[in-house]
């Protein structure tokens, strides 16, 4: 039984399941596999070295799926900012109809470029106040990120069980629940809390089509819900990453009195993280990981994963939950 929501209607997808944009993971292989399975796959724009490379990756994805897919474009905290406008123009010229964004309020500049072309904007937020601001400025769907998520959970430390319904109470546009979701139980819970779909990152990393080393996938299966570290807290740019010797060292150095970001910069470079995903050397850098690791027990195909979530969700709704109603 398909679950029909405003998200499936707006995005033209079969199931309200979105693969979040992930740096050095969101390539055509994964995006097309998710879309072919009835969800929404996303190519990560800034994983590509140039706007021209993004255009080629979009065409490569089109050769692998006839289903809708989108592009993620995140405003990163960096000293050497990429040419966001050039990447946005490639997205527009390629006829992409769905874009996931995240990052600073400056991201609205590319919304203004894209909205006249009918592009649907899905914006990732970690607080209700940010979600309300995004809605006010023309966003179409909010992806609300609970504290359990991989990547940047914000500085408020509010878990999805509270954050999702809190956002639903105030935001009128559709919500995707993100962070700590990886199976049918989380999917049904998200719908009950007021979301109209889910966004998964770490769970899609542990699939056969994810273009990362098997050692990394195995680590997601091996780890439990405690297998993450929160880094950069002192620098007000909190990030949740997989627990390993490098992230342990980042936490230890950051806890020292007077510590500054320069003290850990050599440990957390994006180049090292990208190399880790390719080499499988789990102590050569940091890698993104959410608390959902505790509920990841296998490495299925994207089709198997999505089919399982939808099938088991139907069983929960029609079976276990309905049986509780007197």
Predicted regions and their residues:
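Conserved active-site-proximal phosphate/metal-binding subdomains
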Residues: 154-176, 182-326
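Active-site entrance/lid segments in N-terminal catalytic domains of soluble metabolic enzymes
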Residues: 1-170
């Amino acid at each position: 039984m398909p679950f029909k929501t405003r998200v499936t209607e707006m995005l033209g997808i079969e199931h309200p399941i979105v693969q979040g944009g992930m740096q050095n993971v969101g390539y055509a292989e994964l995006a097309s596999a998710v879309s072919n399975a009835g969800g929404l796959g996303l190519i990560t724009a800034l994983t590509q070295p140039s706007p021209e490379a993004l255009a080629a990756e979009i065409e490569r994805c089109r050769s692998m799926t006839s289903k809708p897919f989108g592009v993620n474009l995140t405003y990163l905290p960096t000293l050497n900012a990429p040419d966001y406008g050039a990447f946005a123009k490639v997205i527009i010229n390629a006829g992409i109809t769905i874009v996931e964004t995240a990052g600073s309020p400056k991201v609205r500049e590319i919304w203004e470029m894209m909205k006249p072309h009918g592009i649907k904007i899905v914006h990732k937020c970690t607080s209700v106040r940010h979600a309300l601001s995004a809605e006010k400025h023309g966003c179409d769907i909010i992806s609300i990120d609970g504290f359990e998520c991989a990547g940047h959970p914000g500085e408020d430390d509010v878990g999805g069980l509270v954050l999702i319904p809190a956002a639903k109470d105030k935001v009128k546009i559709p919500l995707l629940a993100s962070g700590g979701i990886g199976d049918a139980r989380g999917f049904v819970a998200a719908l009950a809390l007021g979301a109209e779909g889910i966004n998964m990152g770490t769970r899609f990393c542990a699939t056969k089509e994810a273009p990362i080393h098997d050692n990394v996938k195995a680590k997601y299966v091996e780890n439990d819900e405690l297998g993450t570290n929160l880094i950069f807290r002192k620098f007000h740019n909190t990030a949740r990453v997989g627990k390993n010797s490098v992230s342990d060292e980042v936490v230890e150095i950051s806890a020292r009195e007077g510590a500054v970001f320069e003290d850990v910069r050599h440990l957390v470079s994006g180049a090292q993280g990208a190399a880790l995903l390719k080499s499988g050397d789990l102590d050569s850098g940091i890698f993104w990981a959410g608390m959902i690791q505790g509920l990841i027990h296998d490495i299925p195909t994207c089709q198997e994963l999505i089919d399982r979530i939808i099938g088991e969700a139907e069983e929960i709704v029609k079976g276990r939950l309905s049986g509780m109603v007197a």
